[in-house]
Amino acid sequence: MLKVMLVDDEPYTLQGLQVIIDWESGGFEIAAVCSNGKEALKYLADNQVDLIISDIKMPEMNGLELLETIKREKISDAAFVLLTGYDDFQYTQRAIRNGCLDYIL
């Protein structure tokens, strides 16, 4: 099974992602649930995942900062997807420049 990390500061969003999607039937398992980028980096220091799905706007470290840190410091080669309500093209450009696989509004 492929390991997935969910990163979002909204508990209802995290809960919804875990319950609504049938991860197992797609060959995925939720390996970690983090409420901000710093928590995600802490988890990734000792663990590997195959896919990171992250919100953009979060306290302490946002999703774009998380993506940039992971790529710059070569912390993980996991596919990275941003799931957000921000439709600002600058966010999209910044995400793509840093290797974001997908940007879901």
Give the residues covered by each predicted segment.
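Acidic, metal-coordinating helix/loop segments flanking the phosphotransfer/catalytic sites
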Residues: 18, 33-51
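Two-component/phosphorelay signaling modules centered on CheY-like receiver
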Residues: 11-32
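Short amphipathic alpha-helix used as the core "switch/output" element in two-component signaling
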Residues: 42, 64-75
